């Protein structure tokens, strides 16, 4: 009884302090938030930040998330003890985890926009974000183990730094968006310079069990400038500019990249089955359109027996245009000789097949003239092929190219894009070459 009274008094005190804090002018509130920053440049080596890629790591992340959401009222308890959403099945979603002494103690998921969209766009206006260009990802499914919630950001700050590093270096993402509880939004605004979206408040956010939510966005391209201005003159430990932009955190395990792919699919067929058919019945909740899209992503035979049944189309694999499991972004140079003059164009290759590719060019490209294209497919993987720009696409600056005879490096790359299932397969591309 006594403990109950004490805990109730503490809650009342916290509520009163929050109310008093809210009456302060916003610049003062933001300054107070920033004064609490304390970033450890050399965390305990037992802390490891990595992509959750094994069944065990993902299950630990989903369990931590479930328990955190239940305790906060963001979901009702699930019999599985896990919070797993359809978005976690997609190759465009990456789950990051923080492990301490081998145990998952923090997690967040990055849901990049795909044919499934992402949760937030159903209720918030993203028109201003889209107008700036660049890919968008939703930061979702954030949870920290109770044992580390009062440690001054010992898990949260490294996890957020990992998110920033991953999005800007590997995930080809310019904007991140969030939907957070109104009580938390000022922390994101003051420390990371999130800006509220149009019509930013939603009283009942279905993705969080009807809890209120505020939508906000962060332009990662602009973040260094904001952080430098806000934390100018601060010591390294008190500066998020130093922490996010200048510091290399030794605890972060960066993903390997043989090729310049921009996502990290981890869902092997058996893992899809385990999380969405066995531990949960997630696939049972999909409508026909969502099932068709799932088939269009996982069109390989080894996935077929695990995908949802009851699909009404006679051939589910043809119900939607086949979607890529891998995304990539490779630089290239296209050179032609025309009337004795050499012309060279800088390209960014974003889609490809065995005998062609789609690329963006900064300047207009002369079409219907054969030349040579050199594409940097990876840090140590270069393809040099005779090519022809066949025409400009409707989208500004995009051109289709035809290849005369793809070389070995190009064939390895395309074969793995078509037949691979996870990021690990990209590191073993030779085995996907046809006999």
What function would you assign to each model-found segment?
Residues 9-55:
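Conserved N-terminal entry element of GNAT/NAT acetyltransferase domains
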Residues 35-89, 95-97, 104:
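Short amphipathic alpha-helix that is part of the acyltransferase structural core
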Residues 2-12, 57, 79-84, 96-98, ...:
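Structured alpha-helical
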Residues 206-218:
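Phosphate-/nucleic-acid-contacting segments
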Residues 167-179:
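Conserved GNAT acetyl-CoA-binding A-motif
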